[in-house]
Amino acid sequence: MLSSKRRLMRLLPLASLLLTACGLHTQPQNPGQSPTSLQWHQHQQAVEKITHYQTRGAFAWLSERQKVYARFNWQQSAPDRYRLLLTNPLGSTELQLDQQGQVAQIVDNKGKRYVSNDAAQMISQLTGMTIPLSNLRQWMMGLPGEATDYQLDDQYRLREVNFSEEGKRWHVTYLDYHTEQNPQLPANIELQQGDQRIKLKMDSWTIK
């Protein structure tokens, strides 16, 4: 298992390039809108109708003990089926996760397959990364998921989310949105839990 972790974590040099891509934006903190507003519910319903899509961009997982940088490609082909690819700067796949229903399969960069009913735990064991997969898909799309503690910006979109699960408190910050789309979808988000940070920069969204 440790050798698998070393193989997966050998990856992804061009850190400075990806950190630039994932760099923080400073947004003016205007007073947010109410989560009970009609405009938010209309936006939420419009996003929830999107069940087939693809998004790609830059991924960074940062902690005191390790740093991981990658390109990512998330393909959602049904409400309960998706594929997540992490690739290195040369375009080679370092990790592929396929989730269908409760069954998850991971293929590492050596072609070794792992199957589990807990994708997040499997990724943690193989790579050392803690990723809240059960809510990540919702948060990536600008939805609160299971969280009930969240704030909106002045455009009736998510600005912050707070969520506790299994003793871990996640804080999600929305830094930018793709304003050319309707409904508007996130372009840059950051998740933090303790000393761990996950940065996601969605370069594009393709809605099918």
Swiss-Prot record:
The gene is lolB. This is Outer-membrane lipoprotein LolB. Plays a critical role in the incorporation of lipoproteins in the outer membrane after they are released by the LolA protein. It comes from Erwinia tasmaniensis (strain DSM 17950 / CFBP 7177 / CIP 109463 / NCPPB 4357 / Et1/99). PROSITE patterns: PROKAR_LIPOPROTEIN. A lipid is attached at C22 (S-diacylglycerol cysteine). GO terms for cellular component: cell outer membrane. Residues 1-21 form the signal peptide. The lineage of its organism: Bacteria, Pseudomonadati, Pseudomonadota, Gammaproteobacteria, Enterobacterales. Its main location: membrane.
